[in-house]
């Protein structure tokens, strides 16, 4: 018997960092994600194979106590073992599902891009084992859970999760008339989401005024019918988060002479930035290549 599951990647458009304190966040599920198949084998073991863009990059075998028998990457097998044990904390009977199977995962995007390699894994595991993915997130990587919501959504979402409460998820439509001038620029430095989450929560207190402003900006961006108005909202959002983090805005840092608007996405300092510009694709590619950045994607091409 073979079971198959799939999870969408994610992109956070508004609310980065403050979504951890209960801000509403606009997030997009992506057409690239991660799939998982579970197939029965004779041995009372868990045989795990992980592929990335068609290539096997990790393989491990766990015994009936979930101890590692064999592994191609001891550090990752330890990390995976911890997640599986966290799943058992929710429901000890899931051990019966974990044994006597071969699990194969297939990541569809470059893991350096920060599109949800961890969140899609948690969602897939939770769907297979029949447990709560948000609880598994809390026990493992931590975070707001918007990425878990994107993993199982077929539409853009507004997402909020207040402390000690269940997530609030509202499906929305995001297809502005100027979407053809929105792009994603990879800043070529993978940020650790879990590390950023921990650092932010350790040093920052709640920001009620900033949260209210970000909520208003997110709603306005969703309704915006003008590329210029949308760009000004991007700029306002960037300024608020910049002041909270005490970090320079990405446009100030790398692209001060750019004709258009640029907003950081996700963990600042790496991952992707949102580009809003009237320049044609060829001119944009040339400009960013001259700055040392070579991966530019249209937003429309990655949205689910």
Where do the model's predicted regions map?
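C-terminal nucleotide
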Residues: 2-8, 19, 35-97, 105-106, ...
């Amino acid at each position: 018997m073979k079971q198959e599951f799939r999870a969408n990647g994610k992109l956070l458009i508004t609310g980065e960092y403050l979504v951890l304190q209960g801000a509403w966040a606009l997030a997009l599920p992506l057409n690239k994600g991660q799939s998982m198949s579970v197939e029965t084998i004779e041995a009372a073991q868990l045989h795990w194979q992980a592929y990335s863009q068609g290539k096997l990059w990790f393989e491990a075998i766990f015994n009936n106590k979930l101890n590692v028998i064999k592994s191609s990457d001891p550090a990752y097998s330890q990390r995976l073992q911890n997640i599986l044990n966290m799943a058992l904390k929710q429901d000890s009977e899931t051990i019966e599902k974990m044994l006597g199977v071969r699990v194969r995962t297939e990541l569809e995007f470059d893991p350096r891009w920060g599109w949800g390699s961890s969140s899609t894994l948690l969602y897939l595991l939770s769907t297979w084992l029949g447990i709560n993915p948000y609880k598994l997130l809390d026990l493992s990587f931590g975070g707001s859970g918007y990425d878990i919501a994107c993993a199982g959504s077929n539409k853009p979402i507004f997402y909020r999760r207040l402390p000690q409460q269940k997530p609030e998820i509202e499906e929305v439509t995001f297809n502005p008339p100027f979407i053809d001038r929105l792009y994603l620029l990879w800043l070529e430095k993978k940020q650790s989401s879990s590390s950023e989450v921990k650092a932010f929560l350790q040093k920052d207190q709640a920001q009620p005024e900033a949260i209210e402003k970000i909520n208003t900006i997110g709603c306005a961006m969703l309704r915006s019918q003008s590329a210029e108005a949308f760009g000004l909202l991007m700029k306002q959002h960037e300024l608020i988060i910049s002041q909270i983090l005490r970090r320079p805005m990405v446009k100030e840092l790398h692209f001060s002479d750019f004709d258009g608007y640029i907003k950081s996405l996700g963990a600042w300092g790496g991952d992707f930035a949102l580009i809003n510009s009237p320049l044609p694709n060829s001119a944009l590619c040339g400009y960013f290549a001259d700055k040392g950045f070579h991966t530019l994607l249209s937003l429309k091409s990655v949205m689910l």
